[in-house]
């Protein structure tokens, strides 16, 4: 214990007694005499220095000195400092943290020992780090720098440029890069083909139209949302855990190599079909506002999987199981055209063991089909050319009502649905509509506008109904229908 105390005292004595590098202290003193960001104050006052003519450099906050009286570290972040900081020629300086100040220039020329620089949140308009060949960490986010050359910094592993007006950036000589941030720039293109060790990429809020991160086998997180992407290549990204690509213009996305994928926010694109069957660990998918109508899930999805898929084109039959849905309503109104005697919505009839309910309207008037069988419908020929509205509900998805606008065309045959044999028969005589059947049968009679005007129940034999002259549709309980003229 005594030996340790003696060593510490000896080191302290050497630090106090050592001469500090005259060139470095002169450059620091010049900076300290400049105006600070706080009005009416100088930089030296922000650091608690009383007199720049009598500075005890060993006690100045944030400075670390090494052998020969050379600076090895400067930690001056968030001090309300301002002006021009010239550190050129500080060839022992390894760490510089001067972020969150109001610096207007920063010179690091010939500082070849630098490995770590944080100068973000300042007012810098240019930076030259071409002589900082050992630099590993550099962050200059939220300044005003339009160009930066990092081709002379092959040891960079961390690079953050966010919030600067870059349009292009050359990463061709940064093979060790593992984290790259360039959010809220003006990037129009970026090439990652020579950065095989990347684990995290953030290029959100730029002007990118294409992005290729294929074969980045170590990539775990990709943030590329809020761009103009029409193409995104993630082939070979076998370690990708999170892909945030929402607010783009994507029409397709191949995730077949992304087996590790867990988190996938993709809303506000134009992806009609999405296949995540190759992603067994996916636990969050957000696809709102894509016009999506198909979502293919893994064979055995995680029980914790949550899906947000409202404002798309899903039908009941295409929606994922309710247990996975955090939100799913509304879905887009659908438009179809069909012959009046063959409207087929049977795909939505039985979903998750629940039977759907169909409600038909012509404007605000409810319409009863002349025939209805498990989601297949027939309507009077007189409705040809009209557009009916069908609302479909299903108890399996209680928050959703599907709406179809169905334009009816001419029937495919004069007889809506022809029976397989001559029985039962429907005909008219002297103002009577007559139904004949050898077995119990119910006949509902409609006008051509779909208004029901009567019901006949036939036990065996014949039943009749007096009607005004006209053309009628008779819907029989055996699933067939007839047209008949009453005179």
Regions found by a protein language model. Give the residues of each.
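N-terminal capping/linker segments that flank leucine-rich repeat
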Residues: 12-91, 95, 112, 133, ...
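Leucine-rich repeat
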Residues: 68, 90-93, 109-114, 132-135, ...
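Bacterial N-terminal signal peptides
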Residues: 2-10, 14
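Canonical leucine-rich repeat
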Residues: 84-85, 106, 127, 148, ...
């Amino acid at each position: 214990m005594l030996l340790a105390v003696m060593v510490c005292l000896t080191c302290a004595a050497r630090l106090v007694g050592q001469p500090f590098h005259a060139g470095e202290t002169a450059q620091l003193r010049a900076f300290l005499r400049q105006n600070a960001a706080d009005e009416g104050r100088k930089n030296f006052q922000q650091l608690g220095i009383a007199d720049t003519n009598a500075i005890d450099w060993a006690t100045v906050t944030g400075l670390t000195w090494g052998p020969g009286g050379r600076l090895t570290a400067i930690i001056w972040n968030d001090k309300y400092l301002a002006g021009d900081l010239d550190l050129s020629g500080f060839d022992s300086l390894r760490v510089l943290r001067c972020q969150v100040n109001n610096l207007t220039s920063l010179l690091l020329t010939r500082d070849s020992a630098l490995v770590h620089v944080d100068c973000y949140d300042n007012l810098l308009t240019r930076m030259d780090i071409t002589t900082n060949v050992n630099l590993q960490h550099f962050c200059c986010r939220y300044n005003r720098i339009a160009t930066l050359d990092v081709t002379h910094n092959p040891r960079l592993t961390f690079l953050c440029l966010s919030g600067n007006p870059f349009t292009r950036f050359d990463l061709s000589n940064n093979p060790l890069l593992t984290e790259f941030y360039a959010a809220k720039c003006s990037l129009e293109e970026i090439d990652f083909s020579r950065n095989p060790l990347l684990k995290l990429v953030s290029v959100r809020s730029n002007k990118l139209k294409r992005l290729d991160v294929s074969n980045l086998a170590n990539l775990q997180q990709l943030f590329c949302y809020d761009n103009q992407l029409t193409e995104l290549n993630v082939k070979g990204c076998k370690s990708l855990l999170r892909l945030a690509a929402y607010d783009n213009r994507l029409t397709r996305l191949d995730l077949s190599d992304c087996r590790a994928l867990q988190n996938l926010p993709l809303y506000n694109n134009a992806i009609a079909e999405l296949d995540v069957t190759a992603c067994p660990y996916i636990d969050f998918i957000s696809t709102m506002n894509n016009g999506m109508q198909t979502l293919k899930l893994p064979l055995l999805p995680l029980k914790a999987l949550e899906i947000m898929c409202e404002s798309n084109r899903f039908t009941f039959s295409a929606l994922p199981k309710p247990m996975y849905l955090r939100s799913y309503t509304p879905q887009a109104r659908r438009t179809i055209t069909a012959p009046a005697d063959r409207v087929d919505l049977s795909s939505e009839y039985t979903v998750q063991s629940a039977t759907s309910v169909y409600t038909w309207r012509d404007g605000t008037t409810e319409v009863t089909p002349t025939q209805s069988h498990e989601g297949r419908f027939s309507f009077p020929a007189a409705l040809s050319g009209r557009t009916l509205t069908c609302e479909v509900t299903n108890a399996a998805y209680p928050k959703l009502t599907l709406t179809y606008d169905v334009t009816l065309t001419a029937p495919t045959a004069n007889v809506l649905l022809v029976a397989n044999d001559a029985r039962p028969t429907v005909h008219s005589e002297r103002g009577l509509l007559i139904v004949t059947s050898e077995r119990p049968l119910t006949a509902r009679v409609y006008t051509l506008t779909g208004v029901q005007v009567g019901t006949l129940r036939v036990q065996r034999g014949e039943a009749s109904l007096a009607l005004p002259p006209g053309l009628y549709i008779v819907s029989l309980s055996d699933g067939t229908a007839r047209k008949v003229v009453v005179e």
